[in-house]
């Protein structure tokens, strides 16, 4: 959890660059990729963020270190963002890595805005999340930062290559397995969905049922969750015959599972607990 100084530094820096990122056009894609790579490098070389957040070190020295590390390899706006970040105060060194990752996602969202694909990417992330719900071994392997990266990449692409996902969705999905950052894979995907929802000003409601929702059901759920969340919602319908009946509804981290299969599993647990007493 970030301290107050880090939360303030992260928020103020991102707010100050929002307009520039929004207006960066196709550069946002490259900026996002550069910042994801830098997050990875900093996470795996903790001495770098420690040096860049050292309160006893002059900002000019930190900027000089940045220039030595990156030279002219990064785009000017990427360097401008990093220069701003190292000039701020941080509660702990690793928090600057979190801010760089936040900026990377922001850049990808602005790229999606520029291509008018923001909702599409958000829905595809929800589709990826839904596809992984019944694949616990795959989820575990994608989260295993100790395993070979190429194996995780191959596993991910075996799962998504036939889905015709947008390049932004693919890049975000790759980041989640390349650099898990102490998060489980599904946790990372949900974190991204939440970010896209806030960015769009609406909530993503994923509804899993055994058969497709009718228009009436979808409209009713939209009304209920618009009132509940206080903002517009997008209903993402997932058909999974294995749930047998009922609905599984996820909004952010909140899950309400009233499917038949969930009730049967709950009944099994109760029976097992009763037998063992």
Curated annotation (Swiss-Prot):
Subcellular location: Cell membrane
The keyword GTP-binding appears for this protein: no
PROSITE patterns, per database record: ATPASE_DELTA
UniProt superkingdom: Bacteria
Classification via InterPro entries: ATPase_OSCP/d_CS (IPR020781), ATPase_OSCP/dsu (IPR000711)
Pfam families: OSCP (PF00213)
Membrane topology recorded in Swiss-Prot or TrEMBL: Peripheral membrane protein
Chief location: membrane
GO molecular function: proton-transporting ATP synthase activity, rotational mechanism
Keyword Cytoplasm: no
One Gene Ontology CC term in the entry: proton-transporting ATP synthase complex
Keywords: ATP synthesis, Cell membrane, CF(1), Hydrogen ion transport, Ion transport, Membrane, Transport
Stated family: Belongs to the ATPase delta chain family.
Function field: F(1)F(0) ATP synthase produces ATP from ADP in the presence of a proton or sodium gradient. F-type ATPases consist of two structural domains, F(1) containing the extramembraneous catalytic core and F(0) containing the membrane proton channel, linked together by a central stalk and a peripheral stalk. During catalysis, ATP synthesis in the catalytic domain of F(1) is coupled via a rotary mechanism of the central stalk subunits to proton translocation.
Subunit architecture: F-type ATPases have 2 components, F(1) - the catalytic core - and F(0) - the membrane proton channel. F(1) has five subunits: alpha(3), beta(3), gamma(1), delta(1), epsilon(1). F(0) has three main subunits: a(1), b(2) and c(10-14). The alpha and beta chains form an alternating ring which encloses part of the gamma chain. F(1) is attached to F(0) by a central stalk formed by the gamma and epsilon chains, while a peripheral stalk is formed by the delta and b chains.
Protein name in UniProt: ATP synthase subunit delta
Organism: Bifidobacterium animalis subsp. lactis (strain AD011)
Underlying gene: atpH
